[in-house]
Amino acid sequence: MIVRTQNSESKIKEFFEFCKENEVEFVDFRFSDIKGTWNHIAYSFGALTHGMLKEGIPFDASCFKGWQGIEHSDMILTPDLVRYFIDPFSADVSVVVFCDVYDVYKNQPYEKCPRSIAKKALQHLKDSGLGDVAYFGAENEFFIFDSIKIKDASNSQYYEVDSEEGEWNRDRSFENGVNFGHRPGKQGGYMPVPPTDTMMDIRTEIVKVLNQVGLETFVVHHEVAQAQGEVGVKFGDLVEAADNVQKLKYVVKMVAHLNGKTATFMPKPLYGDNGSGMHTHVSVWKNNENLFSGETYKGLSEFALHFLGGVLRHARGLAAFTNASTNSYKRLIPGYEAPSILTYSANNRSASVRIPYGISKNSARFEFRFPDSSSNPYLAFAAILMAGMDGVKNKIDPGEAMDINLFKLTLDEIREKGIKQMPHTLRRSLEEMLADKQYLKESQVFSEEFIQAYQSLKFNAEVFPWESKPHPFEFITTYSC
């Protein structure tokens, strides 16, 4: 369905000219592993050859969990010369190039390469005739802390994060002897001005750097939790949007680091306060027309509602990709503006799917509110598209919208209404995914080999260790038994 990325002679020439014009000293080839970690290998510009840009760069794939065994470790990084930018943090002039992974044994794009999977999902949409392009836009929330301490030993398990904004510092004597006292408090941080908002200058610096690397931002503000922020960037096609998430996370972490802070996109680092999500806006277009625009509920089309029906039907297994950590499910609980009930509504932030207000047909879209940034964006976006396409093909009814505050529903009321909820654990979401995976495998977008590698990695690296480790809270509840 998809062939190896081959950079044209004109693209290669254009890239070399770009490097010379910008006096580039290093070329930094970057790729994403299964978990979503951004990895890189750099070459001096003087060592760069035409063949490397045409045929790729060899690397050892056995060093990345879930990929190759050491007996078949050779893979190729294929540079994508439509996506590159000057690294604003490098001491020397370095250009970052997005790469796909190519399988030298099967002579095809590597089926465990997340970026290749995202490309296959977009191509599957085109080949199906349902649409030409799927647009995604992510709103990534994050925390910026002053420091963090972590210990993971057989006799001791703990973490400690700190922030000047933290309510726990109300009685603290700082080094200069002054405690200014302006703090947002738990769930009190939505859009206050300084001095309560201590991170304004860091966020504006983040925006400036994002603009430097080609990301157009449209909103920046303090979020609800203490030490929490959000920067929204413009939408793009599925692959571009996932690339943008990787760029955004890199910039946020680096700007915080250079300001003596530490940034995290972890979904739930603070108990008793709001967590961080990755609200994901989606629309599908064909012949330059928004297929989600129509005459049904809130200006949506039948196509859009069927797309939504597919996502809601598959959401419990979809969560294995959109909410990909054990920590994700500590965010998806009532009371912290994180949706756990699988329904939809217009302008209702308690629903797992929101239909935002739009002033034109072009703005018709869904906002999926359950994903978070512990996910690999290439996999999360691809899985959402595959679920939606399944809904369109099979005309899946999403049910009635629920224009009420869903956070106020009791468990009995949820059961009486027959409403599904998100899984409560990563284990459960993985089990749901394994029981409901056929839609992912259409056109081999997600291969069986990849699905098995993914679930094995998640169980062994996250689920099993989490289930086997004593937790500090258990010592409070159980030590004196």
UniProtKB/Swiss-Prot annotation:
Compartments where found = Cytoplasm
Domain GS beta-grasp per the UniProt entry, residue ranges: 22-106
Query: Which parts of the sequence bind ATP?
Result: 281-283, 349, 354
Co-factor note (free text): Binds 2 Mg(2+) ions per subunit.
> Main location per UniProt?
cytoplasm
List the Gene3D superfamilies hit by this protein, alphabetically: Glutamine synthetase, N-terminal domain (3.10.20.70), Glutamine synthetase/guanido kinase, catalytic domain (3.30.590.10)
Which cofactor(s) does the record list? Mg(2+)
- Molecular function GO labels: ATP binding; glutamine synthetase activity; metal ion binding
An example of a Gene Ontology cellular component annotation for this protein is:
cytoplasm
Q: How is its activity regulated?
A: The activity of this enzyme could be controlled by adenylation under conditions of abundant glutamine.
Q: What is its EC number?
A: 6.3.1.2
Q: Where is the GS catalytic domain?
A: 114-481
Q: State whether it acts alone or in a complex, and with which partners, per the record.
A: Oligomer of 12 subunits arranged in the form of two hexameric ring.
Function of the molecule: Catalyzes the ATP-dependent biosynthesis of glutamine from glutamate and ammonia.
What name does this protein carry? Glutamine synthetase
Source organism (scientific name): Helicobacter pylori (strain ATCC 700392 / 26695) (Campylobacter pylori)
